[in-house]
Every structure is written in C-alpha cells, then in structure tokens.
Amino acid sequence: MEFSKKTRELSIKKMQERTLDLLIIGGGITGAGVALQAAASGLDTGLIEMQDFAEGTSSRSTKLVHGGLRYLKQFDVEVVSDTVSERAVVQQIAPHIPKPDPMLLPVYDEDGATFSLFRLKVAMDLYDLLAGVNNTPAANKVLSKEEVLERQPNLKKEGLVGGGVYLDFRNNDARLVIENIKRANQDGALIANHVKAEGFLFDESGKITGVVARDLLTDQVFEIKARLVINTTGPWSDKVRNLSNKGTQFSQMRPTKGVHLVVDSSKIKVSQPVYFDTGLGDGRMVFVLPRENKTYFGTTDTDYTGDLEHPKVTQEDVDYLLGIVNNRFPEANITIDDIESSWAGLRPLIAGNSASDYNGGNNGTISDESFNSLIATVEAYLSKEKSREDVESAVSKLESSTSEKHLDPSAVSRGSSLDRDDNGLLTLAGGKITDYRKMAEGAMERVVDILKAEFDRSFKLINSKTYPVSGGELNPANVDSEIEAFAQLGVSRGLDSKEAHYLANLYGSNAPKVFALAHSLEQAPGLSLADTLSLHYAMRNELALSPVDFLLRRTNHMLFMRDSLDSIVEPVLNEMGRFYDWSEEEKAGYRADVEVALANNDLAELKN
C-alpha cells in the first residue's frame, strides 16, 4: 500500500479536519506498536514523529531480539519469562525479521566473572525451560574449553574454562519499526514523520484536547485535535510531558548511552554471536556479532545528559570497547582506524528502580543451595504447583546478595511504565524492543477503557499476538520455504540469486511488490537493479524522504556496507532528486546531510 510523501501530506491535511480518537507522539518502536494496534482495532488514529521513524533510539540497539539470559544474573525470573514469551510472539507476527542465532558464551576464571560453568549451566537450563526449548535441538549446550576454541579459535585462551551455547535471535530494529508503521498506515492511521509537537490544546477544565504541531519540512504550524494523546517519545518523554505541565516538572527518565562499533570481518572473524564479560571487573558483558561480512561489538552503558537528538561516540567509548575486544581476541589488534561504522543510541530508562538488569552483572555471592531452591520453585511455578508469590518470595530471599547497592547505569530498570497525568496526557515509557507489543497492548487496554468511560466510544481490541506486521504475512512454520519462493520470483525479474535472497529476507511478504517494480522501472544510473527497486519501494511505500532515511534505516547500508557505500551515495541522491523533483539547492542540502551522517558514522572527528 502506498505510504509516501503524498500520503504524508494527505495525512497532515486529514489530521486537521477531524477529532482523532488517539494521537500518538513518537514514531519509534513503542509508538509504532501502539499505532498498529489502535488502527487495527478501529480507532481513528494519528501518529507524528519529529524525525524519521526509529531515528531517535529504535534504530540504535544491539540489533537482537533478546531472550534475556543476562537477566538471570540478577534472577529476574519474571522478566525472562515475559521476555522469551514476547520474543516468540514477535517471531509469529514478524517472521521475516527475527532470525535464530545461537549465542556463544565463553566463561573465564577471573575476578568478578558473571558465571561459573556450573552457574551458567543452571541459568541456561532455566532459560530454556522458560523459553520452551528444553529437550529440543535449540536447547543449550555446555562446552569444554576445547569445544569453545573449536568454535572460536581466536578467543583468548588464558583463563578460559569452557562456555555454553544458547538460543538468541538477531533483529533488524529499524525494519521492525517501519513494518509496524506500514501496517498501521494500511489499517487507516494518519501518519507523518518530521512533524513536531510544540504544545498542547486544552479545554476549559485544563484537559488536553490535542496538540500544536509544526511540519518541519514546510514550517507550517497547525492543530491536531484528539480525544486522547499518548506520549511514546522514549528519551524525550519528560520533555513532552513538561510541555503540558504548568506545575512541577517531570524527571522520570534516566537515559543511558550505548555505543557499537563495526569492523571488517577480517579483523575479527566470529562464526556466531559471542557474549562475554568485559574482564574489567565492572560486572558488564559485551557482544561481538557477525553481520553482512562485518563484525560489530558493544555496548557501553553510561549515564547521558547531552543532546538527545545527536548522541556521539567519544574517545572514551572507543577506548573502552577496543580494550575489551582486543583483550578477548588477542590477535585482532584493532585500532580506531579499523572502525568502518559506528552508532550511539540512548536507552529510555526509568530511574529509581533496579529490578531489571540490561547489561550489568551482580557481584553477590550466592550459595548453590539458594540457587537450586530458586530453580525448583520456578519449575513448580511453571507446572502450576507454585504461585507467582512463591517465585517472588524465592527471588526476594536472594536480593541481599544479588541486588546492586547503588543504581549504576547498567542496573536502571528496563521495565516500562504507563502514566496518566491530571491533564489527561498518557505517557508510555521505558521497556525493551522485545517487549514493544506487550507494552502497546497494555496501553491500548487503558486507552479503550478511557474512551468508553469518558467519551462513550466503544472498541474491541484485536488479538495483537497473531496480527502480523507489514511483510509478516508468512506461515511462521514455513518461513524459509516461502522466502525461497519469493527469492526465485526476484530471480525471474532479473536479479541475481544473492540480491533476490537479500531482498526477500528484508521485505518478507512484501517482496513480490518490490520485485513487481521491475516491470515499470529502469535500473537507475550507478545503482544495481536491487538498489533501484529497494530505493523506489522505500520512497513509494516506506516514506523515505532523504538519502539518510534510505541508507541508514530502510536499509543498513551505512552500517554494514560502508566499504561500497561511497559509490552509491551520488546515484541515490540523483535518483531521489529526480523522483522528488528536487532543486539543485535542495539536493545540495541532502548531500550535506549525508556528509554529516557519514562523518558521525565514520568517527571522522576522532580519527583526525
């Protein structure tokens, strides 16, 4: 379905002509999930995003759909149970995006180690039990030192005692956002990126009745009326709440910065994702992951108080990650000049709660008896022999030894919150990408209740556990064969096999629409047929308005194809300029935007 500059302009016009049931501020994964469920449930829905979709935070993750093994370091059994069940749901509704990618976790005998081999085995067994993959081919394996090195011979051998392999999933975070957004558009939501909420409309009693918005592309200021407004702006949540608040200013969020660096796979060849302690005794762990003939690694986790729109990678971030990776891979000898791409993102964390651990460890000493008691309680809970209260009681008995004594950045809650202010503004904040659907579901239950109670408008929510995102209309049990069939269709349209498979995996059930463009398009000068089709699909069906939108978020070319990117930047600019009828001045502006994005991506300031 068309989702383009034209539909954006039409959506802005329509938003001014009616009173929406729900206006969503923020087009990251949280807002996208709410928009899909609201539109599919029949609400008159609008969504505005001040940047591009997923630009702020949701395209800057570690690009995994985590099951959350790390949460068992602090024995957050409920968190892991929720996370693995939600991961399974995301696989069902977006089967073309998450891909199984077993994770290797080497264990070292060193001070501050997160796991011993015994504790790792117990944690992995508990994880498999919660994920429902115990006694299946996907179940974990404990490895000897020799078996770890057989899988990953370039790992540091000193202190290595063994390891484990457990099931996790790779993700394309920005694609997950745009596929939710596209489905919401398909179901009737009015959606516009590059529109900023600058203030709120109020009735006589001080209740919010809409927003004052600015189209950042035209500088037009206009009003959008809505029965309910929900703030899903992630790290900006406090700022948006405070636009509407005449009294005490909210300060709920505590964003932390996470940095990832990309090198060519020749610098560090990893056969599968690897996850290990930093070796610095700081209780943290780091991922090293293969993607598109590149290897990327991260992440840092530091408090952040700077510019929310433009977090940057610092020399301190680079030194920290290179020190860790070069220690674990002694032959790598990576320097800053080897870094091809990078990204820095802000996690929208909620302060004041250390219940859930993201990348932190705990350094408490736990007895095997306590550990086994907890596991027995969880197994009894899963077989309905024990209650949730029993599990919470078992966990609480360990809190004195497992909880952080202070809120370091790695221990700030990854949980979510849904609040309604006195003026009626809803704010859905916090959470993790894996949880986005469940967060949206909880918010929509509240929205529907309020619309009924206060506006006498009745809606029945869809079952969002089975409602596919755009591109996700595949049989989850037969994804590979369906993707293969789509790829063969691409080959029949003139693509080579590698390109056809790449696009089929990227677009899922939308791949035939992408390939169909080959009938009416000529290959753009300087671009492959695959990039020509992908670019035009992004402009016509994914509201990509700039080269950076396309090169960084609709595709990951800037991150994982940096060595070949320079050759297509100008052809992409030319083709978009022709399609959008840009003036030379406009094209120069977009070229400058690409140069800024590449300078940040390439760490140009740090390398000079």
Regions found by a protein language model. Give the residues of each.
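Extreme N-terminal leader/targeting segments of oxidoreductases
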Residues: 1-22, 37-41
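C-terminal accessory subdomains/tails of enzymes that are appended
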Residues: 10, 14, 51, 93, ...
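Core beta-strand elements of the Rossmann-like FAD/NAD(P) dinucleotide-binding domain
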Residues: 18-20, 217-228
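Short hydrophobic core segments
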Residues: 24-25, 224-234
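Glycine-rich Rossmann-fold phosphate-binding loop(s) that bind the pyrophosphate
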Residues: 26-28, 50
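Glycine-rich FAD pyrophosphate-binding loop
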Residues: 39-59
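Dinucleotide-binding Rossmann-like beta1-alpha1 core, especially the glycine-rich loop
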Residues: 63-147, 151, 286
